[in-house]
């Protein structure tokens, strides 16, 4: 790659940049990755333009510059590059490097979807589901999620599963919800893993199975997903699908608290109030209840009120 890159072969330059980014066969270096991405981008290679744009977006090897990131994504998009089109849409959707504009986001998502981007199909589906930048149309959202899901997009699979769960835009079907949650869960998506675990927990679309529920909650928890860690705490507290263990419950609640879960703050507060899995500490319980209460957790608000009483 280096020999070809030094002879200004843009594909080789981009590939060499990726090797420096990933540290494969060379010492990892964002600065060298940027150097070679830039060389290929300046020759007009869309893939390199997108890779360099990403470096500017997240400040890897260069100071973060969202405006420059957008400019580079736009260059790739103007060549019809699916990733470039999708990333321009995201810039407009979230106001990164440009003024937020949902209508513009929809237009670019549509172009990216037409170019075959499954991620764009999913995000365009979200726009139709929520009525952001376009009139709300659940049937269209379902169609787009299905296209994305069948192309293997995990978010599209999970979103389609949720519409089957809720019966919005499609006939309600727990079996179809489980089918699509499983597809996304097997790709490692924490939200889908938790949704599938919940189906096993309550026997929705599958036979109730606590061990399978714990399996999927743990998969999400091991990725530090707040809901997954909170639900593992519940399972350990009550011995659902695992042996009852207060210390393990506290461990998972604490992880979920660190990830911002108000429900976990409340439940960990209960552990401190009662001395379950930890030494009893009313002051720590009150502190946790207050944190959760300030995040509008109703149970914590009630528990905090009781302590004041």
Which residues fall in each region the model found?
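Hydrophobic face of amphipathic alpha-helices that form TPR/SEL1-like repeat modules
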Residues: 15-22, 51-58, 87-94, 123-130, ...
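Alpha-helical tetratricopeptide repeat
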Residues: 73, 77, 84-86, 189-192, ...
